[in-house]
Amino acid sequence: MRASELKRIPSLVASKRRVVVIDAWHGLRVALATLSACVLLGACATKPLVPYSTDTPPMILAPATQAGIADERGRFREIYCAVLAARGPGLPDYRPCEDALTRVGTEPAGTGKPIALGQSRRHLVAAVVPGIGYDCFKPWLNPPDTVVTHLRQFGFDATLIDVDALSSSAHNARQIRDAIMAMPEPDGAPRIVLIGYSKGAPDMLEALVAYPEIRSRIAAAVSAAGAIGGSPLANDAEQYQADLLQYVPEATCTSGDDGAVQSLRPATRKMWLAQHPLPGGLRYYSIVTFPQPERISSILKSSYDKLSRVDSRNDSQLIFYDEVMPGSTLLAYVNADHWALAVPVARTHPTIGALFVTQNAYPREALAEAILRFVEEDLAKPPGR
C-alpha cells in the first residue's frame, strides 16, 4: 500500500464514523418524535390521574372469579410452555416459560391433558386490531411478518385490520365491521379470532356490539393488553398531543375524527361497558400484561411511575385489572411491558432498542401460537362446559 493511500485511511474512517453518527442521530430523532407525540404516556402534571367525579356508573373492585371471570391460567400455561419448549431457542426473543409469564396470586393447576402441537384442525385466523397511533408509525417500524410466517407453519393464519390511528373507538368499529364483511364468508364454523391490542380492544368490542352482522363470522374475541377499562393516563392527555404522531417520519395517518384519547379515558370506557353488555354466543378471552418492574423499558419508566400513583401493577400504560373483558376467560398474566407484547421496536431498530426500548424482547410468535391453540381447544368444548 502506498504512503498516500495510508494517509487517506484516517479520513475515510472519520467519514464512516460521521455517517454512523448521522444515521444514529436520525434514528434518535425518530424515536424522540414518536415519544414526544405520545406524551399521554407520561405527562408531567401533578393533578390526580383519576379526578373527582360523580359521572360514573356504580363500580366495584372484586376478585375475578366473583365477577364472572373464568380463570384458565393453569391450562394456558401448559400450552404456552409446551409451545416454547417445542419451538425452542430458535424462536426470536426466546424466553423460558417461567420468565415469560407472571404468577399472580394462586394460579390454578394445569390439567395434565395432552397438548396438540401439530396442524390446526380449525385453521383459525387471528385478525388483529392495533392500538392508538399504529397507522402513524407502522411505516417507520416496518415490522417483520415473523408471527404470520410462524403461524402458517401450523395451519393457522393472521391478518392486520387497518383502523384509523387517531380516531374514536366508535369510528374504528365501523372499519372493523367493513373489514370483516369483506372477508370470505365461512362455509363452516367461523375461523376469525379477533385480537384487540391496547385501544384496539375497545374498538373491537364496539364493533361486536354495534354490528351484529359480523358475529356469525367470529369464532372468538381476545383482549391482548386491551384498554377495556381505559387508562388513567388518558385523563391527563389531550387529543392534539396524540395528533403529533402524524409527524413521525414516513407517517401517512390523519387525525381522523380526533376521538382516540377520549375513547381511552376511564370514564368513557366504563360508562360504555355499563350501557353495552357484550353479545352472547361468543367466547371472550383476556391476556393481561403484568410485568415485573425490571421488565419495563427505560423509555416507559416515567409513565410506569406516573401510573403507579394509582397502582404500581401496571404495564406503563394500563393497570392490570383494566385489561380484563367482562365475562371473559383469563388466560395469562404476561411478563412484558405494554410495547413488548406487540410492538417489536428493538427488532427493526436495534440502536433505539438498546438505548430506549430496553425491555422490548418477547417471544410473540410463541405467544400467538399458544393463544390460538388454547382457543381452538376451548371452542371444541360445548358452551358452558
What are these regions (language model features)?
Residues 1-26:
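N-terminal secretory signal peptides that target proteins for export/translocation
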Residues 174-274:
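Serine-dependent carboxylesterase/thioesterase catalytic core
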Residues 126-128, 159-162, 193-194, 222-223, ...:
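Structural recognition of the beta-strand scaffold that forms the well-ordered cores
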Residues 31-42:
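Bacterial N-terminal signal peptides
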Residues 279-385:
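C-terminal catalytic-base region of ester-bond hydrolases, centering on the histidine
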Residues 117-191:
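Active-site catalytic motif of lipid deacylating hydrolases and related acyltransferases
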Residues 2, 44-140, 150, 383-385:
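Flexible, membrane-associating and regulatory peripheral segments of lipid-active enzymes
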Residues 132-135, 164-167, 198-202, 226-230, ...:
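Solvent-exposed loop/turn segments at secondary-structure junctions
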